[in-house]
């Protein structure tokens, strides 16, 4: 981003709380990294999973260097490229092309001195999207992709139930995320049944409003549902397929433990 804007420094203020403690995770089959950026190939997540689980660490070729730097054993690293297919238990994972043009210029070398043939190979080495085919439904993870006509290709090649699509509001002079209309269009091209917007709340500099995506989808009579989730909530497919919001389950579940006969108030109608 510094490279694309010419800024001397960037202020990546995190604007969403950490709602999961990685050290509390004791069971994990695979850690899938979409690309080399530190918020998607994260030391503070990798280390706990390395120590407390037997999971595989999966990612594009250039993430292998990062995994090894974090002391992940070679036999737990799975390097993949577009077109590769592998299984983790009953989930078939397809590595497909990424369209993350920001990661494409995350490079120490002088980009002007890289031959176009070599430059064209960088994306596949540094970033991937994933299609997870499960017995119950299929999930598409767009990583940090920008909008691309290739979403249409992926929609023709795979049946997508849920599309996880990054978007945000870009500052003037900077394009790091898809905008709300891009996110709508990506999900439509993928033929998704549900669009779950993501990454819009991670960084203050590109913080977006997911109801903008919902508004566009409603205006365009989108053939999919936009589901907006609160941080730390859980989406269950297909039970939640028609839900437009996922709230904290405690709001419902906690009432089951209330006992009206034990209420202790000054008089019954106090509250």
Residue ranges and their predicted role:
Residues 1-36, 44-48, 102-114, 120, ...:
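Pre-active-site segment of Zn-dependent metallo-hydrolases
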Residues 26, 72-75, 89-91, 125, ...:
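Structured loop/turn residues at beta-strand edges in well-structured enzyme cores
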Residues 28, 54, 159-160, 192:
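Local beta-strand N-terminus motif with an aromatic residue
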């Amino acid at each position: 981003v510094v490279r694309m804007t010419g800024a001397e420094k960037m202020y990546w203020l995190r604007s969403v709380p950490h709602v999961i403690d990685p050290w509390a995770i004791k069971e994990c089959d695979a850690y899938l990294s979409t690309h080399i950026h530190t918020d998607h190939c994260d030391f503070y997540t990798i280390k706990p999973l390395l120590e407390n689980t037997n999971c595989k660490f999966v990612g594009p070729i250039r993430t292998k260097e990062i995994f090894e730097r974090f002391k992940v054993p070679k036999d737990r690293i799975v390097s993949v490229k577009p077109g590769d297919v592998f299984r983790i238990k009953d989930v078939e994972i397809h590595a497909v092309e990424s369209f993350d043009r920001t990661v494409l210029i995350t490079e120490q070398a002088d980009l002007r001195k890289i031959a176009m043939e070599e430059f064209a190979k960088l994306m596949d080495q540094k970033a991937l999207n994933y299609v997870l085919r499960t017995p119950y439904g299929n999930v598409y993870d767009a990583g940090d992709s920008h909008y691309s006509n290739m979403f249409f290709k992926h929609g023709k090649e795979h049946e997508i139930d849920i599309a996880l699509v990054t978007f945000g509001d870009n500052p003037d002079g900077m394009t790091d995320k898809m905008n709300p209309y891009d996110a709508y269009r990506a999900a439509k091209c993928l033929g998704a049944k549900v669009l779950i917007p993501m990454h819009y709340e991670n960084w203050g500099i590109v913080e977006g409003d997911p109801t903008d995506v919902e508004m566009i989808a409603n205006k365009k009579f989108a053939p999919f549902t936009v589901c907006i989730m609160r941080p730390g909530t859980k989406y269950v497919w297909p039970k939640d397929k028609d839900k437009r919001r996922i709230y904290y389950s405690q709001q419902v579940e906690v009432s089951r433990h209330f006992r009206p006969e034990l209420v202790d108030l000054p008089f019954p109608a106090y509250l």
